[in-house]
Amino acid sequence: MPRWWRWKWPTFCAAWILEQVAAKRKAAAAAGATGRRARSMARRLALQALYQLQMNPRPLAAIQKQFVADPESDRADLDYFRELIAAIAPQREALDTRLALLCEIPPAELDPIEHAVLWLGLHELTSCADLPYRVALAEAVQLARQFGATDGHKFVNAVLDRAARELRPNEYGQPLP
């Protein structure tokens, strides 16, 4: 092996690995992202879109278009993202009414991130009967932990746990299968 090859070899390997990763991502995007991680990414994008809707009210179609054009959206289940945004945006007031009954803090005084996470979690608890409540709760808490205030995830957990107890009494408290 020539002496100069030892210096070029790591660069060549790194470039080849990056090309392989990019090709796999492109193939997954072309096939349509599905699975648990794709749904989590769709929830994350929905959270960001709901936050943006609170901070900078714009037409829903423009916000959806912006997030679908984002390179990170290749890893997300875009159908689920669109479904979440299309369902949550028009019923924000109804979700706020339910939130007012579940927590002591008025919805208008909630932190915007926790507010959006609670909308997302409440929607999944009320409208996604095929989704176990533990999954909806865990995903919402994870988003609050990742994007929210220091102890915001504890508040989100308490509110959504109370909501799950009321909305899904048959499923709540059952042992894991």
Give a label for each model feature.
Residues 2-146, 150-177:
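N-terminal interaction/assembly modules
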